[in-house]
Regions:
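Active-site-adjacent structural elements in folded domains
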Residues: 63, 137-142
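Non-catalytic DNA-recognition/assembly elements of restriction-modification systems
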Residues: 3-33, 159-171, 175-187
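Short coil/turn segments at secondary-structure boundaries
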Residues: 3-5, 36-44, 135-137
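Sequence-specific dsDNA recognition surfaces
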Residues: 8-9, 24-35, 47-77
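A short beta-sheet element
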Residues: 68-70, 74-125, 129, 140-142, ...
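Generic, well-ordered alpha-helical scaffold segments in large soluble proteins
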Residues: 26-30, 78-81, 85, 113, ...
Length: 187
């Protein structure tokens, strides 16, 4: 039998109509830095790490933003570099039509137009992906740990056909609803 290095990279078996892809192969994001202080009276929609837990971006004026940010688009998926064990993955959803969308440089931005963003979020929140993230961190531990974008872009993720992505998203939403319903009845 011939040695095939390709199969050594396959993390686990997937259905025949799914494909394994490296994040770098699907990511169309090209970084564009914006200094909000150059537009002090403009208001921005800012995806920052501290506001992640609220589920909502913040809406500061340019004069109140201390550092340059990265311009993002609706549908981009943000993967937090800081403390990757905290599993912070966020889908950019435009709240205010007239505001420029920005993200902190502490996010790895994934723009994969052919893949449903919610599916990417679920995949990147999975134990499989979390284990990958934790396998190549830098820093001495605790709050100093960082995911390395050069490694992350080489991680392989399973991509099903669009209809299957939709089904997975719907099924996970149903399970989450069941969990929330049960949790609300507990003392």
């Amino acid at each position: 039998m011939r040695h095939s290095p390709h199969y050594e990279q396959i993390p686990f078996e997937i259905p025949d109509n799914w494909v394994w892809v490296k994040i770098d192969e699907i990511n169309k994001f090209k970084s564009k830095t914006v200094n909000p202080q150059n537009s002090p009276t403009d208001q921005f929609e800012l995806y920052s790490v501290p506001t992640f837990e609220t589920g909502e971006p913040e809406f500061p004026y340019g004069k109140d933003v201390a550092s340059s940010k990265v311009e993002v688009e609706e549908g981009d998926v943000l993967l937090c570099k800081i403390n990757p064990h905290l599993n912070r993955v966020w889908r950019v959803k435009r709240r205010m039509a007239q505001m420029k969308l920005l993200a902190s440089s502490e996010w790895i931005v994934i723009r994969a137009n052919e893949i449903i963003p919610e599916y990417l979020v679920l995949t990147m929140q999975s134990p499989y992906f979390r284990e990958l993230m934790m396998s190549n961190v830098s820093g001495v531990g605790g709050s100093l740990m960082r995911a390395q974008p050069t490694f992350v872009k080489q991680y392989m993720i399973p991509i099903p056909p669009v209809r299957e992505q939709e089904r997975i998203i719907e099924k996970v939403a149903q399970f989450n609803l069941y969990i929330d319903t049960i949790a609300s009845t507990l003392p």
